[in-house]
Amino acid sequence: MNKAITSMTVLTAFVLLMFATSASALDGTAILEQVDRKMQPESYEMYRKLINIEPDGNRKEYILYTAKKDQDKMIALFLSPASEKGRSTLRLGDNMWLYIPNVGKPIRITSLQSVIGGVFNNSDILSLDYNVEYTVKNITEEGERYFLDLKARNASVAYDGLKMEVEKSTLLPMVIECYAASGMLIKTLRYDKIEDFGNGLVRPSVLETDSPLYKGYKSVMVFAKLQEKEFKDEVFTLNYLPKVDELR
C-alpha cells in the first residue's frame, strides 16, 4: 500500500513538473511574440538612417526606405548617398538579393555579408520578427527585466543564439547579445530613445551595435515614420526591385 502511494506521489510530482516546464516555455514564447508586435506591425513601411562610425571618428551615412509584409517578406531601397541611390535589397525567408541599377539581374547575398559595410550585417538590416528565426530555450526574470535565451531555428540564421534583455513594463528589448555556435560573442545590440510613432506604436527609435571583432567601430540605426501598411505580394519579387521607389 505504502509502495503504491509512493509511486502515485512520484507520478503526480512528475506530471506537475512537466506542466510547469511546459507553462514556462509557453510564457517565454508568448513574451517573445509580444516583443515582436511591440516593435512593429507585421506589415509596415519605415525610413531609416544607418551610420557607420570608424575608430578615427569618420562617419558614413545611408538613408533607406523599407517595406515589410507578413513574417518573411522585406524590401529596402537606398535613397542616399548618391553613389548608392537606386540600389535595393529583397529578403524572402532565408534568401536575399541585391539589385544594382545598370548592372543586370539581382545578385544573391548572404545574411552575414553587409551591403553597407560596418558592424550591421544584412540580417540586421533586413531583420524579421525574432520569433520567426528563434525559439525560446530559457527565460528568467530579475528585477524589472526578463532575460530570454534564444536558439536559431536553423543553420541559415545569422546568429546561432541570442541573449535578450526585455523590460517587463513595456515588453521592449533593451540589450541583445548575438552569439556564434562556438559560443563566441559576435556583437551587442542596444536599443535606445523610446518614441511614439503613432497608432499605439511606442518603441525605441535608435539601435546601436558594436563588436569585439571590429574594435573601435560602431554602427547606428535611426528609425523614422514607422507605420502599418499593406502591400501586394508582387512588391516582394525580383522583378519589382527596380521599381521600389514607386511605393513611397
Where would I find each of the regions flagged by the language model?
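N-terminal signal peptide c-region/cleavage motif recognized by signal peptidases
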Residues: A20-S22
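Bacterial N-terminal signal peptides that target proteins for export
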Residues: M1-L11
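Gly/Pro-enriched, hydrophobic low-complexity segments
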Residues: S127, G143-L238
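Extracellular or lumenal secretory-pathway regions
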Residues: Y44-E45, D70
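Flexible, processing/modification-adjacent segments and terminal tails
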Residues: A25-S43, K49-I51, N58-K60, S83-D160, ...
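Extended lipid/amphipathic-ligand handling interfaces
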Residues: V35, L64-K68, R190-G198
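N-terminal post-signal-peptidase region of extra-cytosolic proteins
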Residues: I75-E84
